[in-house]
Regions:
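Glycine/Thr-rich phosphate-binding loops of Rossmann-like dinucleotide-binding domains
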Residues: 34, 103, 137, 201, ...
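Hydrophobic faces of well-ordered beta-strands that scaffold small-molecule active sites
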Residues: 3-7, 24-26, 53-57, 93-95, ...
């Protein structure tokens, strides 16, 4: 089990050292723009890092939508992201589940997901689908939909990323999320380990620092005890607060 944080891309190694992580997650292009990542100038440095590196794909990507003007650019941006991530040996690229929109065919959304993963297979990069917090037309908010998606894509080079804030906000009890994710995939590939500023089933994606939000501490501790996988904190407050959250996780793993 490796523990780290989502940190800045430009000084990733230095920031990871500061929060005392042995893994980290970065964006390699703007999360809110349709701009493909540029080749990294620090490939050698990243390749020499002694731990897994995760890349979070831009938030704009929605490979499930029936809207061609969004789906096609999403596939291109995902593939370009995978190519650059592969260049420095990233372990996986994390992508939000997306949505089919009002009146969309969710079954078609699952098929679009399969096509998107197939398109990036030649990059060798593993895709991790992340559960999301809100939206009744979302692919990966409700557990039943996540399970149906897995039936369509589970034989490909793909895994699941469990975000604890998102499952809480999406109305999936934490222990149930862990058990059902593991039943699907045998091993959860990655946990985005975040507390929540909001109440259960709020559909609001507002992360909070560990132990300071609304998710009961015993629920968070259950995740650490039962997931046995890499942990990335995506909590607010900058590096100083993330350093505290990384330490929070380490204390509970060693006790």
């Amino acid at each position: 089990m490796n523990i780290g944080a989502h940190i800045g891309s430009a000084k990733a190694i230095e920031e990871n050292d500061y929060v005392k992580g042995n893994t980290f997650q970065i964006f390699i292009s703007s999360p809110q723009m349709w701009r493909s990542p540029k080749p990294r100038e620090d490939v050698d440095i990243l390749q020499d890092f002694n731990g897994p590196i995760y890349v979070h794909a831009p938030y704009l990507i929605n490979v499930a939508t029936p809207n061609n003007k969004v789906r096609h650019p999403s596939r291109k941006l995902l593939k370009d992201t995978c190519k650059v991530a592969a260049s420095f040996g990233a372990k996986a690229v994390i992508v939000h589940g997306g949505s089919v929109g009002e009146g969309g065919d969710i079954g078609q959304g699952y098929d679009y997901w399969r096509k998107a993963i197939q398109e990036v297979e030649n990059t060798g990069m593993r895709i991790l689908v992340e559960n999301t917090a809100g939206g009744k037309n979302s692919i990966a908010r409700e557990m039943d939909s996540i399970e149906r998606l897995w039936e369509v894509i589970g034989d490909l080079n793909v895994g699941l990323c469990l975000d604890t804030c998102h499952s809480w906000a999406g109305g999936i009890p934490t222990q149930e999320a862990v058990k059902r994710f593991k039943k699907l995939t045998k091993k959860i590939d990655l946990v985005h380990f975040n507390d929540s500023k909001d109440t259960f089933n709020s559909s609001r994606d507002r992360h909070q620092n560990l132990g300071k939000g609304n998710i009961p501490i015993e629920e968070l501790e259950y995740v650490l005890k039962n997931c046995k996988t890499d942990i990335i904190v995506e909590t607010p407050g900058g590096l100083d607060e993330q350093k505290k959250d990384v330490a929070w996780v380490k204390r509970r793993i060693t006790n």
